[in-house]
């Protein structure tokens, strides 16, 4: 709710037309009820799009293993460390973990294969499946109209997190690298790269 409030303060009170979950980590879906009303999703007014097997992996990783992972996350991300005039110790992905309410609305539309397309509010999206990378169910998306490539959490401005201390599933670096290469081959004309946790990369050479 705070994030969309910040957006609307600068861009106007624009309605949410769709929700896309890129992968199964709670920091990428847990704020959904602050953005849309579940009743609107259930009524078919707002689609919620996610990669195949999203719910299975979201439940297994965040519910079944959740209590243990939450405890270990305090060691991985350091949310209890003090802040000071020179800043704070963090994990690189962000300054700290969220302490807000987590929520989840089940997807209404699953992306099943690389190359699947959806038109959302008149804008075309092309999806690329990237399972068993930074998350067990993950996908990238490309918006041709803006030449913008969204790599979910698979291309951020830090070292890839292959072995999470909190106990999330170990990542496959070979698969991860193959999906990055495939994205470059599929969407080589991209001019903007979005990595979600960090600032965009602008210009084809930087992408």
Language-model segment annotations:
Residues 30-34, 58-64, 69-70, 160-163, ...:
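Short acidic, glycine/serine/threonine-rich loops at helix termini
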Residues 24-30, 55-57, 134-135, 156-160, ...:
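Active-site environment of divalent metal-dependent phosphoester hydrolases
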Residues 2-47, 188:
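Active-site metal-binding motif and surrounding structural segment of the metallo-beta-lactamase
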């Amino acid at each position: 709710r705070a994030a969309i409030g910040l957006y609307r303060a600068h861009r106007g009170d624009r309605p949410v037309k769709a929700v896309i979950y890129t992968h199964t980590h709670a920091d990428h879906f847990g704020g959904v009820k602050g953005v849309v009303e579940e009743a609107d999703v259930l009524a078919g007014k707002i689609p919620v799009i996610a990669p195949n097997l999203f719910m299975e992996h979201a439940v297994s990783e965040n519910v079944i293993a959740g209590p243990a992972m939450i405890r270990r996350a305090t060691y991985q991300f350091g949310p209890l460390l003090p802040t000071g005039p020179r800043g704070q110790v963090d994990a690189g992905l962000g300054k700290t973990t969220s302490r807000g309410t987590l929520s989840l609305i089940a997807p209404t539309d699953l992306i099943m294969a690389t190359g699947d397309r959806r038109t959302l509010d008149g804008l075309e999206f092309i999806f690329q499946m990237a399972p068993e990378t930074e998350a067990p169910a993950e996908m990238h998306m490309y918006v041709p109209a803006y030449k913008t490539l969204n790599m979910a959490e698979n291309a951020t401005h830090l070292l890839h997190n292959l072995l999470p201390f909190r106990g999330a599933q170990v990542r496959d670096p070979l698969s991860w690298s193959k999906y990055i290469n495939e994205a470059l081959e599929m969407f080589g004309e991209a001019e903007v790269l979005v990595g979600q946790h960090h600032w965009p990369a602008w210009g084809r050479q930087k992408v």
